[in-house]
């Protein structure tokens, strides 16, 4: 049974509805899937129903923005029964993410007459385009040629994740466990592009001390060296070994990256604990 446990719907920044995600997964021959939208679980009800109707094995998930030392990282939470406290953490993280766009426009409106916070707050976009409000607003107001180029503007104006009150990894893991779920580090290759494997292992050991449950070892941009490092660490410490292609639908960046099912991994090649 082929597995892909990292994909997004239009409830965060993907371009597909939850039902369309499940239908595409079935067409691609996947058997075990999860929608892990950024800081929201709005897709869960539709996703669960679609999986049941189409006979797909599934696990409910969410991708949380977190702080890990000096890094901004993502945690994938799976198989949890959300309680009031964890729901509040998810909601707060979503608010922090949205606030980044508000703060960017507050800065930029001082330099440009044709944009304003009031204009931004009243702005809407077609969520089927994927992405998120801030980058679509910048594109529609003429600041970028391509929607994704808006990310650079956030950086140029120093609107960084590290400036916002996202939960720490330790806090997130604690609440995921209270809810009976599993906490998995998403796409380490995005944080450790220029790191040695020794540096990676050092951070993994810190995560282990925080009771992380697994690592997304198989991911489109991972090098063979990093993949092997992740797998070995998980095997050595009895952690989950997961796979995710991070499909955002039409927002997927390149032909061979971030396409649903682009990494072919059978359930028997992984180590899953749900």
Residue ranges, per PLM feature:
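A generic structural signal for short
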Residues: 9-11, 35-36, 92-93, 122-123, ...
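Hydrophobic, aromatic-enriched interface-forming segments
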Residues: 111-173
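Charged catalytic cores and adjacent phosphate/nucleic-acid-binding surfaces used
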Residues: 1-9, 15-28, 41-83, 171-185, ...
């Amino acid at each position: 049974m082929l597995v892909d446990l990292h994909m997004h719907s239009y409830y965060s920044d993907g371009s597909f509805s939850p039902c369309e995600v499940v239908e595409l997964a079935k067409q691609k021959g996947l058997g075990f899937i999860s929608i892990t939208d950024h800081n929201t679980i709005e897709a869960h009800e539709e996703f669960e129903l679609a999986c049941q109707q189409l006979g797909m094995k599934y696990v409910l998930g969410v991708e949380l923005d977190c702080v890990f030392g000096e890094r901004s990282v993502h945690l994938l939470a799976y198989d949890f029964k959300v309680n009031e406290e964890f729901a509040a953490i998810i909601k707060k993280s979503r608010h922090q993410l949205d606030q980044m766009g508000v703060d960017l426009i507050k800065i930029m409106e001082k330099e440009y007459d044709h944009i304003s916070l009031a204009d931004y707050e009243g702005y809407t976009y077609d969520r089927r385009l994927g992405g998120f409000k801030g980058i679509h607003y910048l594109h529609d107001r003429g600041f970028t040629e391509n929607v994704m180029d808006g990310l650079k503007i956030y950086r140029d104006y120093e609107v960084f994740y590290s400036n916002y009150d996202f939960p720490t990894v330790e806090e997130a893991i604690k609440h995921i466990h209270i809810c009976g779920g599993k906490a998995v580090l998403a796409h380490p290759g995005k944080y450790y592009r220029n790191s040695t494997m020794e540096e990676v292992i050092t951070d993994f050991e810190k995560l282990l001390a925080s009771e992380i449950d697994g690592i997304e070892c198989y991911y489109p941009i991972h090098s063979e060296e990093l993949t092997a490092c992740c797998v070995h660490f998980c095997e050595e410490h009895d952690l989950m070994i997961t796979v995710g292609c991070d499909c955002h639908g039409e927002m997927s960046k390149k032909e061979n990256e971030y396409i649903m099912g682009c990494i072919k991994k059978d359930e028997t090649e992984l180590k899953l604990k749900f």
